[in-house]
A protein has these predicted regions:
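Short aromatic-glycine-(Arg/Gly/Cys) micro-motifs in beta-strand/loop hairpins
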Residues: 7-21
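A short, exposed loop/beta-hairpin motif centered on an aromatic-Gly-Thr core
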Residues: 22-32
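Short, charged, surface-exposed hinge/linker loops at domain edges
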Residues: 1-3, 36-71
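Short, surface-exposed helix/turn micro-motifs that flank interaction/cofactor sites
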Residues: 17, 35-36
Length: 71
């Protein structure tokens, strides 16, 4: 499966979350670190769901950029 991950840069590092998996988040000092950690978080999240007998949700989120004219 392929889930969309949102990565945000903060003052002290990076944060990431998966819109299709509420509560699945990670933080790291670098973009590479947060991407590694969110992969681990997704695997753990899905494994926990399987253990509880829940089906993994189909990926359904998408993203788009909108362009607006500069003032």
């Amino acid at each position: 499966m392929r889930y969309m991950v949102i990565v945000e840069k903060g003052e002290d590092g990076f944060g990431a979350y998966v819109p299709d998996l509420p509560g699945c988040v990670a933080v790291g000092e670098s973009r590479d670190e947060v991407l590694r950690l969110i992969r681990e978080a997704v695997e753990f999240h899905l494994e926990s769901m399987r253990e509880e007998g829940a089906a993994a949700p189909d990926p359904s989120s998408s993203s788009e950029y909108v362009e607006i004219p500069a003032p």
